């Protein structure tokens, strides 16, 4: 409720704040703000870098949060959860590691016109480095993902697919299970940008059949500067 968010009690230009920009970044509830304050005030130290009490406490909290994310996504192991600085960093990590290592000149990546820039720019950089080709899937006349166009776009040269779970502009939600099943049936890995979708839809990464999945904390009522890559 509104009372859980301290910032929503302030006035701007004589009116109580009504915040409608959650697709860009969400406000923080008191529980999150107090959790940050508690940690920074009492337990903060370097993680995995010391044997003293504060370092042990910080490391324990760090790894416990990884297990919480594992449970949230229904991952098989907490080792499958990678902390990043956000959604953009997660895409860049996949592009500069897996894709950079496994794609060659002339290979194709498929992305959609619904993507956030964070799921576009890294693939342009990869194109400059490796000479790959980018194929675009347009929305249909209703602003929805065109699965028929997507299926026709896949060729023997298609080596990677990156698609949003939910458009931050249109709110359209492609059927990611269909996309993954179709792609994996032809041996093509998939990255799902879940920054918008994870807020609204329950995710079971085991059902996604080993697809890359990512999201950020600041759109999920969490702190800035934290992201997840599965």
What is each of the regions a protein language model found here?
Residues 1-230:
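Pyridoxal 5′-phosphate
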